[in-house]
């Protein structure tokens, strides 16, 4: 696995050994502190000139070059136009810097720009970007680390910045969020033969060490609760289902909780409506929503969030054996509503139907947000740079959108409406689980909406962003951990004033 760097903050100093990293603005501008760090402004100019480096955001240039103080390598990191930096740009800068440090044991990053003051929270974002970029899932590779291109040791990184106190304090929070993102990535990257519903639940139970109350419901409890929709999906697999309830109580008094629900199909063959063989291996990631909820609960507990939060994940495997549910079957959900199964590959919404109703009925939350790798249709509509956002509450939708813009985990709102709702009406039951080809992500959301009553609710379709999304400066992993930073920001901005 990846070797996570050790990061500290310091006032400006001249690096004594290892790698010196400095920032360069678009057009070649850099601060006096950067020039001092590398032994002279002419070195920065020469490296930039030889490399054709312009200072564009996220671009880098490097040179094996010594300084009088003992530095062996100099790295330039472009920041673009300093006055326009925002959202996740500082994470990109940190990730780009980390990508160039190689096997260095000591790294000094000088965070200074001409006529610009870099705040402590921006420095913390740079550090977070470095931690997230350091992630690598290779636990099943048996080659030696040097053959696999992995650093021999964890780097010790010193970030020099004007406001060290604020940077340290903010990074303490950011590290807890990084822990949550990394947990989500690990869960999604794990192969399905290793991580089934039982094993996933065991991973969630480890959050008890952080003060999270964890309850795991097995098949008997689910039957007693009447979760026919979830159990219908699970009946084709020899691996028993689980429903995991995670509670974090960080607010004073008996404040109503906020709730997050995740789809956790640990492997999705499609069931009897079986998927094509090509790329089916990616369906180990069909629990990306549950992974994000688990990672979020870890982040909230790790930073001692002052909020009461509930995380509920439905864990099943969708397999096509002789006991699997069939197209045409009718199941009764926990809510009492009946569902005709048109397509067994539209299984995630069945799992969520019972998980959403259970969460709403038991906890009476202020709102519910569910995450699910639910439809390929949302990828057709939005590609892999935005997750789909559906909501019955404009205020909640706006808050989520803003959190997405702030973190770079972007959302785009798609419609709901009675016309779409009619498309899931069934001739034989209260509703059907698939309405056909058109508006697939919308009709899936309409289906979920029937299980939340009047509670403010949002559905995030993360099929295009939780796994296999394009790599960026701070994520080179197949699993992105999408949703953890987004929802943590929502909680901080809106519910921890």
From Swiss-Prot:
GO MF annotation list: manganese ion binding; metalloaminopeptidase activity
Subcellular localization(s) per the UniProt record: Cytoplasm
Q: Where this protein primarily resides, as one coarse class? A: cytoplasm
Q: Name one GO cellular component term.
A: cytoplasm
Question: What are the names of the required cofactors?
Answer: Mn(2+)
How is the cofactor bound, as the UniProt entry phrases it?
Binds 2 manganese ions per subunit.
Uppermost EC category = hydrolase
**InterPro entries, per this entry?**
Leucine_aapep/pepB, Macro_dom-like, Peptidase_M17_C, Peptidase_M17_leu_NH2_pept, Peptidase_M17_N
Q: Which domain of life is it from?
A: Bacteria
Q: Where does Mn(2+) 1 bind?
A: 268, 345, 347
**GO BP annotation list:** proteolysis
Keyword vocabulary terms for this entry: Aminopeptidase, Cytoplasm, Hydrolase, Manganese, Metal-binding, Protease
Cite a single Pfam family from the UniProt record. Answer: Peptidase_M17
Q: Which reactions does this protein catalyse? A: Release of an N-terminal amino acid, Xaa-|-Yaa-, in which Xaa is preferably Leu, but may be other amino acids including Pro although not Arg or Lys, and Yaa may be Pro. Amino acid amides and methyl esters are also readily hydrolyzed, but rates on arylamides are exceedingly low; Release of an N-terminal amino acid, preferentially leucine, but not glutamic or aspartic acids
PANTHER family in the record: CYTOSOL AMINOPEPTIDASE, LEUCINE AMINOPEPTIDASE-RELATED
Family of the protein in this entry? Belongs to the peptidase M17 family.
- Name of the protein this chain belongs to: Probable cytosol aminopeptidase
Q: What is the name of the gene encoding this protein? A: pepA
């Amino acid at each position: 696995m990846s070797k996570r760097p050790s990061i500290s903050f310091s006032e400006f100093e001249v690096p004594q050994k290892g790698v010196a990293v400095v920032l360069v603005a678009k057009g070649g501008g850099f601060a006096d502190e950067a020039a001092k760090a590398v032994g002279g402004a002419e070195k920065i100019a020469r490296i930039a000139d030889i490399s054709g480096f312009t200072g564009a955001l996220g671009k880098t240039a490097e040179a094996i070059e010594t300084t009088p103080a003992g530095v062996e390598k100099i790295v330039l990191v472009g920041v673009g136009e300093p006055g326009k930096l925002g959202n996740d740009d500082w994470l990109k800068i940190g990730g780009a810097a980390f990508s160039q440090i190689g096997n260095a044991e000591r790294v000094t990053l000088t965070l200074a720009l001409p006529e610009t003051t870099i705040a402590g929270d921006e420095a913390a974002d740079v550090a977070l970007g470095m931690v997230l970029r350091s992630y690598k899932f290779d636990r099943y590779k048996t080659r030696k680390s040097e053959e696999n291109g992995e650093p021999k040791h964890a780097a010790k990184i010193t970030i020099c910045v004007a406001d060290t106190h604020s940077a340290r304090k903010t990074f303490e929070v950011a590290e807890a969020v990084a822990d949550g993102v990394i947990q989500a990535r690990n869960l999604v990257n794990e192969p399905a033969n290793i991580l089934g519903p039982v094993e996933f639940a065991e991973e969630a139970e480890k959050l008890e060490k952080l003060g999270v109350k964890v309850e795991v419901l097995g098949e008997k409890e689910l039957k007693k609760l009447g979760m026919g929709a979830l159990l219908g999906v699970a009946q084709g697999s020899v691996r028993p289902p689980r429903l995991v309830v995670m509670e974090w109580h960080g607010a004073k008094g008996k404040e109503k909780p906020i709730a997050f629900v995740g789809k956790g199909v640990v492997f999705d063959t499609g069931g009897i409506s079986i998927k094509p063989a090509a790329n089916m291996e990616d369906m180990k990631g069909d629990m990306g929503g549950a992974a994000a909820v688990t990672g979020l609960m870890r982040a909230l507990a790790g930073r001692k969030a002052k909020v009461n939060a509930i995380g509920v994940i439905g864990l099943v495997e969708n397999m096509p054996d002789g006991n699997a549910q069939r197209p045409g079957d009718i199941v009764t959900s926990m809510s009492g509503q009946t569902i005709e199964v048109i397509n067994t590959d539209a299984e995630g919404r069945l799992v969520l139907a019972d998980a959403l109703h259970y969460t709403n009925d038991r906890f009476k939350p202020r709102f519910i947000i569910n995450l699910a790798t639910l439809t390929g249709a949302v990828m057709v509509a939005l590609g892999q740079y935005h997750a789909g956002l559906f909501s019955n509450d404009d205020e909640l939708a706006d808050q989520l959108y803003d959190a997405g813009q702030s973190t770079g985990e972007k959302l785009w709102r798609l419609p709901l409406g009675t016309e779409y709702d009619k498309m899931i009406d069934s001739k034989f039951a209260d509703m059907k689980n698939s309405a056909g080809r058109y508006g697939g992500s919308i009709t899936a959301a309409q289906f979920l909406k029937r299980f939340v009553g009047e509670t403010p609710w949002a559905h995030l379709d993360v099929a295009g962003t939780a796994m296999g999304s394009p790599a960026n400066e701070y994520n080179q992993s197949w699993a992105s951990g999408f949703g953890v930073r987004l929802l943590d920001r929502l909680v901080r901005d809106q519910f921890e004033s």
